Amino acid sequence: DKDTYKVSGGLHGVGVSCVNALSSLLVATVHREGKVFQQKYSTGNPQGAVEVVGQSDRTGTTIYFEPDATIFATTEYKYETVSKRLRELSYLNKGIRLTLTDLRETDEQGRHLYEEFFSEGGLKEFVEHLDSTRQPLLPAPIHVEKTDGDIPVEVALIYNNSYSENVFSYVNNINTHEGGTHVSGFRRALTRTLKSYADKSGMLEKAKVEITGDDFREGLTAVISIKVAEPQFEGQTKTKLGNSDAIGAVDNAVSEILGYYLEENPREAKLIIQKVILAAQARQAARKAREMVQRKNVMGGTSLPGKLADCSDTNPERCELYLVEGDSAGGSAKQGRDRSFQAILPLRGKILNVEKAQEYKIYDNEEIKNMITAMGVTFGTEEDSKALNLTKLRYHKIIIMTDADVDGSHIRTLILTFFFRYMRELIEQGYLYVALPPLYIVKKGKEERYAWSDAERDAIIREIAPEGKEDSVGIQRY
């Protein structure tokens, strides 16, 4: 309804009507014209007429609601979720002050948990917040703010010393996780404008390297926010924008202001283009490294890593691969496995932290090469030369099995990071698992029991040892 709201989340959103229908009690209180008006509802039905309940010298609306416990299994709100969303909204709507108070608990001084969210810089501050743990390449974010036709466009972007792309997009304050036409417009403008500048500067010709769109986005953090009167989303969840006019609006705004920025800031422009050239060189090196890993696999036939204790079954649906921490753990894992369907691959030490390494170095890493070879995966499909190809995947269960200590947690995190960044399809298709190691083994005589917590350990001791004979129980901490 454009007469009521200039922009909104569009149809089918979880607005006040939906919240009202799903609440056992909703109270709407409105301050206007010197009075306080109030109406109560239950499961969407008015419990009486609108009443005047007092006088007021201000304006505003308060909504109080209690979720219906007959509909929701859980009616408890997570403070962190609400806090994160309000912080996000404060950046997207600069100059607006939002407050969050949790009345459920108090601290030692009897105070309720309270936060205030306010952003004067808007998306520029948002980008700095997102990049707070990275080293920036530019002294300040590049800021785009322009209305193209009927579409207000705001973008903030900055480059950092990482190798990943982080682009966050919003339409009418809704987070469009899957992107859409506004992100397409941004990428088109970024690639074209930077390519044009790089060509004119002569830096590309000097470097003798071929650039692709991905190279312009390595180490980029950006937030895109547009306002559209009638948003068209693909799917009910509103995670992808479909409005075709958003492409041109974002493209025009970003092209114009980014072009000015590059001309007026030649030092920063040179840093960006140097970063792009390095990304292109690293991409070509990574492609060669990937091809080398795959060529060895092909030329070697069924040559598998020497440390792999493979299983006898060849049906991937029945086979499991355990990635274990070191040779000693690999030895005990081999002793305890069922060799018909369980394979063991010991990994030596901590694998490479792929979050901080260039891609070509990843495929040179011995442990990562062993994992790729053992799993049988390749890179490259008809649609995408970098995409993971799972047609020859040898195991449908890949289990990360590390120790229950700090080192084990670190190794597990490094392995998960590799899979998330370079083999996400394995996670999405449900092939990746994490083993939950016990913390203790409790022994008494020939009896051995495992415990996954201190409480479970104590319960086992009470169960197997008479009172006063606890010393007869042996406990080993893993």
UniProtKB/Swiss-Prot annotation:
Q: Where is this site: Interaction with DNA?
A: K350, N353
Essential cofactor(s): Mg(2+); Mn(2+); Ca(2+)
**Residues of the Toprim domain:** 319-438
Which residues make up the binding site for Mg(2+) 2? Answer: D403, D405
What is the E.C. number? 5.6.2.2
List positions binding Mg(2+) 1.
Answer: E325, D403
- List where in the cell it is found: Cytoplasm
State the GO CC annotations: cytoplasm
The biological processes this protein is annotated with in GO are: DNA topological change
Q: Which InterPro entries match?
A: HATPase_C_sf (IPR036890), Ribosomal_Su5_D2-typ_SF (IPR020568), Ribsml_uS5_D2-typ_fold_subgr (IPR014721), Topo_IIA (IPR001241), Topo_IIA-like_dom_sf (IPR013760), Topo_IIA_B (IPR000565), Topo_IIA_B_C (IPR013759), Topo_IIA_bsu_dom2 (IPR013506)
What is the cofactor note? Binds two Mg(2+) per subunit. The magnesium ions form salt bridges with both the protein and the DNA. Can also accept other divalent metal cations, such as Mn(2+) or Ca(2+).
Name the PANTHER family for this protein: DNA GYRASE SUBUNIT B, MITOCHONDRIAL, DNA GYRASE/TOPOISOMERASE SUBUNIT B
**Assembly mode:** Heterotetramer, composed of two GyrA and two GyrB chains. In the heterotetramer, GyrA contains the active site tyrosine that forms a transient covalent intermediate with DNA, while GyrB binds cofactors and catalyzes ATP hydrolysis.
Function noted in UniProt:
A type II topoisomerase that negatively supercoils closed circular double-stranded (ds) DNA in an ATP-dependent manner to modulate DNA topology and maintain chromosomes in an underwound state. Negative supercoiling favors strand separation, and DNA replication, transcription, recombination and repair, all of which involve strand separation. Also able to catalyze the interconversion of other topological isomers of dsDNA rings, including catenanes and knotted rings. Type II topoisomerases break and join 2 DNA strands simultaneously in an ATP-dependent manner.
Q: Mind telling me what this protein is named?
A: DNA gyrase subunit B
**Which organism does this record belong to?**
Eisenibacter elegans
